[in-house]
């Protein structure tokens, strides 16, 4: 079989302007970037505001493993098969961060014959949205550091006299806003800034990866440009000596930060291998942020398509949970059905049983033990009140006996249905049965339900998420988190939803606990207010907001020839 890159290069692409017109966009609603991608102007969203909505399908997965479950492959494959069945369909996915592209995970365009193309353009830069987020974020960091420098240098009276601005009285070490970069770089997690003469008061800070920026979450959750501007104004950049928050609006930088992101608020239109439209927009990680593509992209797609297929990052305890309790809560766009991706290899890896055998080799004991993880995720999705279809992403090494056993086992669960998917090797022909089952699932009566109401106390939300969302026996708060809980509740932020920042490699907080962990307590070390994004992040265990590169990073495979052809992506 050809490599992902070769398949992408040999694809016969539609001119993006023609594809956009077929999709229902007007010429002046597309800002073309060559013939392969285009920004979608928000005038399209305004024009389509009263259109009837299509069906929204959310793709999730079992607990991820190093072998890859094929969630994006299934998302794109399902989209292609829905199109092949005569439906008007659109995929909505996140823009890949270059951190994972050059780290371990690789690209995020799908794979095989279920790809968004050209894949190298998607995986590297695209239309520059992540760079815009980085630049806007770092302007905020430069602005608050500069304000601290000038206020310290001049004092209150002289500062207000010379600048015509209010004295913010920023507390020493009161700056909360880190800088960001779109790479994995662990040495930047903790730094000292402002060192040296005339460089401002020194303070401890750090870098996060851009995908973890609150600005990225704002981009993904905003309903329109005005909403994004209002949310950016609420960003908490620092605190003053009295402990009160200093916002981007207080600093006077919110307008400029939004201006940098004026084009980033527009989704990017690309296409799948069989010419189905795909909107790529925003890229928050699901372990350290809320892990879903944008509300704006979903809104536009739902007004133009019969079916919209999107995905949440990692397993159903991560991106899917946050899709429901954060994204759908804020947007009001509820899914009609969910697709839960699994593989034989994933179940064996999640069995908790050690074995020297090849993960591809038949192993009924490990398969049966790992099935508990799949069943947990089925029940987890079902508790939100929507039908769930299990998609078994088939690999060439899978045996019919194990596949048949798994299909029969799923029949005894709460799943609406279970189908094999061979989209990777067969493209649109490989997921037709899956598409038909998903279409039937979308017609089922359902009542989308959130895990907790807005008015629930913040501590109760944490407990509910841990106990019901993960199966824990409870939560434990560090002393710092206890104080933060009191402060956030006193300031009136208790009605916000919770975004758990935890490992994706286990349903629990501990990546070593496989299968369906029991009897564990979720340790919350810190609570962080994201006033602009509209949620509170609970940092759990040892999760980091700046990843590091591994021993054998992905960039080792990437190169470019004299002809300009890039190799090693995917």
From Swiss-Prot:
Enzyme Commission identifier(s): 6.3.4.3
Gene Ontology MF, one: ATP binding
UniProt xrefs under Pfam families: FTHFS
SUPFAM superfamilies in the record: P-loop containing nucleoside triphosphate hydrolases
Chain positions recorded as ATP binding sites: 65-72
Keyword entries, A-Z: ATP-binding, Ligase, Nucleotide-binding, One-carbon metabolism
Domain of life: Bacteria
Catalytic activity: (6S)-5,6,7,8-tetrahydrofolate + formate + ATP = (6R)-10-formyltetrahydrofolate + ADP + phosphate
UniProt-listed GO biological process terms: tetrahydrofolate interconversion
Pathway involvement of the protein, from the record: One-carbon metabolism; tetrahydrofolate interconversion
Xref: HAMAP family: FTHFS
Family: Belongs to the formate--tetrahydrofolate ligase family.
Protein name stated in the entry: Formate--tetrahydrofolate ligase
Source organism of the structure: Shewanella sp. (strain ANA-3)
Lineage: Bacteria, Pseudomonadati, Pseudomonadota, Gammaproteobacteria, Alteromonadales
Gene: fhs
């Amino acid at each position: 079989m050809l490599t992902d890159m070769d398949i992408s290069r040999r694809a016969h692409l539609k001119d993006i302007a023609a594809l956009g017109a077929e999709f229902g966009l007007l010429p002046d609603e597309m800002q073309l970037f060559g013939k392969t991608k285009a920004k979608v102007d928000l005038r399209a969203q305004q024009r389509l505001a009263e259109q009837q909505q299509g069906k929204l399908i959310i793709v999730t997965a079992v607990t991820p493993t190093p072998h890859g479950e094929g969630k994006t492959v299934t998302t794109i494959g399902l989209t292609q098969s829905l199109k092949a069945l005569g439906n008007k369909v659109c995929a909505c996915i996140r823009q890949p961060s270059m951190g994972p592209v050059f780290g371990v995970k690789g690209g995020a365009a799908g794979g095989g014959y279920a790809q968004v193309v050209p894949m190298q353009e998607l995986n590297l830069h695209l239309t520059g949205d992540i760079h815009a987020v980085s630049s806007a974020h770092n302007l905020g960091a430069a602005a608050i550091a500069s304000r601290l420098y000038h206020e310290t240098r001049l004092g209150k009276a002289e500062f207000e006299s010379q600048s015509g601005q209010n004295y913010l009285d920023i507390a020493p070490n009161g700056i909360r806003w880190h800088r960001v970069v779109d790479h994995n770089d662990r040495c930047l997690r903790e730094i000292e800034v402002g060192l040296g003469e005339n460089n401002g008061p020194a303070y401890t800070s750090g870098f996060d990866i851009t995908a973890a920026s609150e600005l990225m979450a704002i981009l993904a959750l905003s309903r329109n440009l005005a909403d994004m501007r209002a949310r950016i104004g609420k960003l908490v950049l620092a605190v003053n000596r009295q402990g009160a928050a200093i916002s981007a609006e207080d600093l006077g930088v919110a307008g400029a930060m939004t201006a940098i992101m004026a084009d980033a608020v527009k989704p990017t239109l690309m296409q799948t291998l069989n010419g189905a439209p795909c909107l790529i927009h925003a890229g928050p990680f699901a372990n350290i942020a809320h892990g879903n593509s944008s509300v704006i992209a979903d809104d536009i797609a739902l007004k133009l398509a019969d079916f919209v297929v999107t995905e949440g990052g990692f397993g159903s305890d991560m991106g899917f949970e946050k899709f429901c309790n954060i994204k759908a809560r804020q947007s009001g766009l509820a899914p009609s059905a969910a697709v839960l991706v699994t593989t034989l290899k994933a179940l064996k890896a999640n069995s908790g049983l050690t074995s020297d055998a090849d993960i591809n080799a038949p192993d009924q004991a490990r398969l049966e033990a790992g099935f508990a993880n799949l069943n947990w995720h089925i029940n987890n999705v079902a508790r939100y009140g929507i039908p769930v279809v299990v998609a078994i992403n088939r690999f060439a090494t899978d045996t019919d006996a194990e596949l048949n056993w798994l299909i029969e086992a799923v029949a005894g669960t709460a799943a609406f249905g279970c189908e094999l998917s061979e989209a990777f090797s067969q493209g649109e022909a490989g997921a037709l049965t899956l598409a038909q089952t998903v279409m039937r699932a979308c017609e089922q009566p359902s009542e989308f339900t959130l895990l907790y109401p807005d008015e629930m106390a913040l501590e109760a939300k944490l407990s509910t998420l841990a106990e019901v969302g993960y199966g824990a026996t409870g939560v434990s708060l560090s002393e710092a988190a206890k104080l933060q809980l009191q402060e956030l509740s006193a300031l009136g932020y208790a009605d916000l939803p919770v975004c758990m920042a935890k490992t994706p490699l286990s349903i629990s907080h501990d990546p070593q606990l496989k299968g369906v962990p029991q009897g564990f307590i979720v340790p919350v070390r810190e609570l962080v207010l994201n006033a602009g994004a509209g949620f509170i992040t609970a940092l759990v265990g040892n999760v980091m907001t700046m990843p590091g590169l591994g021993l054998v990073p992905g960039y080792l495979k990437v190169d470019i020839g004299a002809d300009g052809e890039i190799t090693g992506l995917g």
